[in-house]
Curated annotation (Swiss-Prot):
Listed GO biological process terms: L-histidine biosynthetic process; L-tryptophan biosynthetic process
Gene: hisA
Active site, per annotation: D8 (proton acceptor), D129 (proton donor)
UniProt-listed Enzyme Commission number(s): 5.3.1.16
Pathway info: Amino-acid biosynthesis; L-histidine biosynthesis; L-histidine from 5-phospho-alpha-D-ribose 1-diphosphate: step 4/9
Subcellular location: Cytoplasm
Top-rank taxon, per record: Bacteria
Keywords, alphabetical: Amino-acid biosynthesis, Cytoplasm, Histidine biosynthesis, Isomerase
Organism expressing this protein natively: Anaeromyxobacter sp. (strain K)
Gene Ontology MF terms in the entry: 1-(5-phosphoribosyl)-5-[(5-phosphoribosylamino)methylideneamino]imidazole-4-carboxamide isomerase activity
Protein name as it appears in the record: 1-(5-phosphoribosyl)-5-[(5-phosphoribosylamino)methylideneamino] imidazole-4-carboxamide isomerase
Record's catalysed reaction(s): 1-(5-phospho-beta-D-ribosyl)-5-[(5-phospho-beta-D-ribosylamino)methylideneamino]imidazole-4-carboxamide = 5-[(5-phospho-1-deoxy-D-ribulos-1-ylimino)methylamino]-1-(5-phospho-beta-D-ribosyl)imidazole-4-carboxamide
Cellular compartments per GO CC: cytoplasm
This protein's record includes keyword Amino-acid biosynthesis: yes
């Protein structure tokens, strides 16, 4: 199972939001590439990068920071946030991004997901963000009335092989990851699932591994020193 550290970007800086609230932001690093290099040294084989400005705007914003992260030796990058057109997807893949994570597009533009999967096979993932069971889009700012399993089934049919599921209500709150919900989603939709949101310690990593998930994304717990990446990588491999 993969442990995937997260780098969230606003204004070219590494930040974390509390419950996805843009008004509750903490800046953790001014240099994203330096942070990425540190994560690679600690054992990261994949880094989850989110362009939060892009998620809000609807197109990629932090391209300079993304380019710098991709240039770090040993850094394999997946990028989400504002990827809602084929030219934008192509642009970030050309920067060196390995996988794109489509969130809003997975709900509003299933045709785009299909086209992207056909054009860039194996490089398109879907981010499904839910609060109280309802899928949220546009940087978690808009509700959809849809459930996570329904969206996961749709993107699987469109060609997506892996879904990253975030419980928005837990994100940045250290309340424990929803490994059970992620495993249920994996079983119901028949697609590989990576869990995200609420990771508080190594027990969450072990819970995700025990649930048979493809991976777990670790963000704030890493930046607040509640979890060491090297230890988490070891726990995932136990």
């Amino acid at each position: 199972m993969l442990v995937i550290p997260a780098i969230d970007l606003i204004g070219g800086e590494v930040v974390r939001l509390e419950k996805g609230d843009f008004a509750r932001k903490t800046v953790y690093a001014r240099d994203p590439a330096e942070k990425a290099a540190e994560l690679v040294r600690d054992g990261a084989s994949l880094i989850h990068v989110v362009d939060l400005d892009g998620a809000k705007a609807g197109w990629p914003v932090n391209l300079d920071a993304v380019r710098a992260i991709c240039a770090v030796p040993g850094a394999e990058v997946e990028l989400g946030g504002g990827l809602r057109s084929l030219p934008d997807i192509e642009k970030v893949l050309e920067l060196g991004v390995r996988y794109v994570v489509l969130g809003t597009a997975a709900v509003e533009r299933l045709d785009l997901v299909r086209q992207a999967c056909a054009r860039f096979p194996g490089r398109v993932r879907s981010g499904i963000d839910a609060r109280n069971g309802e899928v949220k889009i546009a940087g978690w700012l808009e509700g959809t009335g849809l459930g996570a399993a329904e969206v996961a089934r749709r993107v699987k049919e469109a060609g997506v092989g892996l879904v990253e599921y975030t419980d928005v209500g837990r994100d940045g709150m250290f309340t424990g990851v929803d490994a059970e919900g992620a495993a249920r989603l994996q079983a119901e939709a028949g697609v590989q699932v990576v869990a995200s949101g609420g990771v508080a310690g190594l027990d969450d990593v072990r819970a995700c591994r025990a649930a048979g998930l493809a991976g777990v994304i670790v963000g704030k717990a890493l930046y607040e020193g509640r979890i060491a990446l090297a230890e988490a990588v070891r726990a995932a491999a136990e």
